[in-house]
């Protein structure tokens, strides 16, 4: 479990996270939702150690991540998989080389052992035949799946996904959602996903946290979202649904 306890984050004089307290459940898909500027990406990056916080604590099980020095944090970083917005693949590297990067950085495995693990992960995301292709030769959905293969190559305990469906068509987004959900349960990972897509929430969300203006406004299950009386949450759900309808093809 990952426990966030009363964290605060400022950029200059602007407070972007205010007294956030939430537990993210082990072995489940935990979704952070909110409008642009609500603080969800900052929160995700703070949990992953990519942003320092100004106060509060972040616990990985019983370990206070915020109290560790950089060297001590490496042990936890090795247990993290990250899927960045846009997949963030290296253009100069093949799909296989992109997936292998964490193994090159964190392990002293032989090249044959690394490639065996890489090929296993590419096959797991149904891309076993594209290892020698470059990102420019792949569709957006295929790039996202390469990113997912890279995220799981270290057999992580924690998976962080920043807007995994950004830029994808609805059908491809469904495929990515299902794949992330399957891998979460297969690897028993604590998965945290940032999204503004209510389709993703209703499809795979097991715990949902709603941020509003840098604060935790609401948390619960996807089944209770539509029963909530929280005005900010209801406004967000309505706006998300309107945006979805406007994107649908007109006949």
Regions found by a protein language model. Name each.
Residues 48:
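Helix-to-loop junction immediately C-terminal to a conserved catalytic motif
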Residues 56-64:
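Conserved ABC transporter NBD signature motif
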Residues 111-129:
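Conserved ABC ATPase "signature" region
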Residues 134-138, 142:
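Conserved ABC ATPase signature
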Residues 153-157:
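A short, proline-enriched helix->beta-strand linker immediately N-terminal to the Walker B motif
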Residues 170-172:
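Helix N-cap at the start of a conserved alpha-helix in ABC-type nucleotide-binding domains
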